[in-house]
């Protein structure tokens, strides 16, 4: 990532931070075994190997890097971006080129394995000093992003340590006053991602709503009454689909949209009306040759008298006078709802196309229902 003035490049790369097998057994340099005597020994499909991703910056001019890269985490054994899902959104240049903000979890071994407590650290390029700006916030901090004028820093935050499915709130820090404000504290849903508006007076974000994923606008306010009543939050889009990967443009909100029957395509949404214009048609020629399942959205009464949203996918050419085998898709959660997803692994459309009635309930405890 380039600094705002284009004079530096910010990047991460792996450095040796722990003992490797060849350190213990130098006589066997070609050995590819994994020796484990402590947690954390694996992140999903990636084993702990004595290497950690750390953050560097290097001077840059006219297409060339100049001098030597500086590791702003030099001497530590911590990582940034964090495993397993951390990416470039965990790093941010301050608007005036003098500071870098990054996410890390300053724990190792067993303590690292059972904790979700990441923090945002501020590195000063002039003094080479590092400060934890979220000290005392015990949950998962993620995705720091500056307002367009550089006066505020926003990020996603979970409250509780060790609870990876906690509610994601949006925190805004006024860099001049030092005041932190949780501006979604009283909103009864969890955020997925966000972007600042062009004028910095509002924030657009993605969030779930009754097993769909939509775009919202949040107007910045100090009025406690508005915060408690949710008056500062407005839902922009609707419909039975997932909207993700949103970017703010001069012409509207550009985002990816998919549903059970259609893979992701790009849409441009009007921020005021929520109307979406389809910008790509990558798969339309293929869809024209496919008999699609019919999707039904049903609210089923549960045994305790509540309502449960359930998706039913009927096979192509479904005949209600015939009997069909059924498949029950029972997703566990609690990280995500059973939304109208298009998966290359669990593709419910493909299952229905083979002659099954697919039943996909949003069981109790899944998000997007408050």
Residues covered by each model-derived region:
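Short, solvent-exposed loop/turn segments that connect beta-strands within catalytic domains
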Residues: 62-66, 164, 222-229, 272-274, ...
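Short glycine/acidic-enriched loop and turn motifs that connect beta-strands
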Residues: 16-19, 107-110, 159-163, 209-212, ...
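Serine-hydrolase catalytic core recognition
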Residues: 48, 242-370
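Conserved beta-propeller blade repeats
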Residues: 1-9, 41-49, 75-103, 110, ...
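Predominantly five- to eight-bladed beta-propeller fold
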Residues: 11-64, 69-75, 103-121, 264-266, ...
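Predominantly a core beta-strand signature of beta-propeller blades
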Residues: 68-70, 128-132, 178-182, 224-225, ...
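Short loop/turn segments that connect beta-strands within beta-propeller blades
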Residues: 60-64, 124-128, 174-178, 219-223, ...
């Amino acid at each position: 990532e380039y600094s705002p003035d284009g004079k530096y490049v910010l990047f991460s790369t792996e450095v040796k931070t722990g003992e490797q097998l060849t350190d213990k057994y130098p006589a066997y340099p070609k050995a590819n075994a994994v020796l484990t005597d402590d947690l954390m020994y694996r992140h999903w499909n990636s084993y702990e190997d004595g290497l950690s991703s750390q953050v560097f910056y290097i001077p840059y001019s006219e297409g060339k890097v100049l001098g030597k890269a500086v590791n702003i985490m030099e001497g530590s054994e911590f990582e940034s971006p964090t495993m397993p899902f951390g990416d470039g959104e965990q790093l941010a240049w301050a608007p005036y080129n003098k500071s870098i903000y990054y996410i890390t979890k300053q724990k190792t071994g067993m303590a690292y394995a059972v904790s979700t407590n990441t923090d945002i650290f501020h590195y000063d390029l002039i003094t080479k000093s590092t400060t934890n700006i979220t000290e005392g916030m015990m949950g998962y901090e993620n995705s720091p992003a500056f307002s367009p004028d550089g006066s505020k820093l926003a990020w996603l935050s979970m409250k509780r340590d060790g609870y990876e499915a906690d509610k994601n709130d949006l925190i805004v820090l006024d860099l001049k006053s030092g005041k932190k404000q949780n501006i979604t504290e009283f909103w009864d849903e969890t955020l997925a991602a966000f972007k600042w508006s062009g004028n910095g007076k509002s924030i657009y974000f993605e969030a779930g709503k009754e097993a769909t994923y939509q775009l919202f606008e949040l107007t910045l306010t100090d009025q406690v009454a508005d915060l408690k009543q949710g008056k500062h939050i407005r839902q922009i889009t609707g419909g039975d689909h997932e909207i993700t990967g949103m970017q703010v443009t001069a012409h509207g909100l550009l985002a990816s949209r998919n549903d059970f029957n259609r893979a992701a395509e790009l849409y441009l949404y009007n921020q005021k009306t929520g109307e979406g214009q389809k910008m790509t048609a990558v798969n339309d020629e293929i869809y024209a040759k496919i008999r699609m399942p019919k999707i039904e959205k049903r609210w089923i009464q549960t045994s305790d008298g509540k309502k449960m949203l359930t998706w039913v996918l009927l096979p192509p050419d479904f005949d209600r006078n015939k009997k069909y085998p059924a498949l029950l898709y029972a997703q566990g959660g609690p990280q995500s709802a059973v939304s109208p997803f298009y998966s290359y692994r669990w593709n419910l459309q493909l299952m229905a196309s083979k002659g099954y009635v697919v039943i996909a309930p949003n069981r109790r405890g899944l998000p997007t229902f408050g």
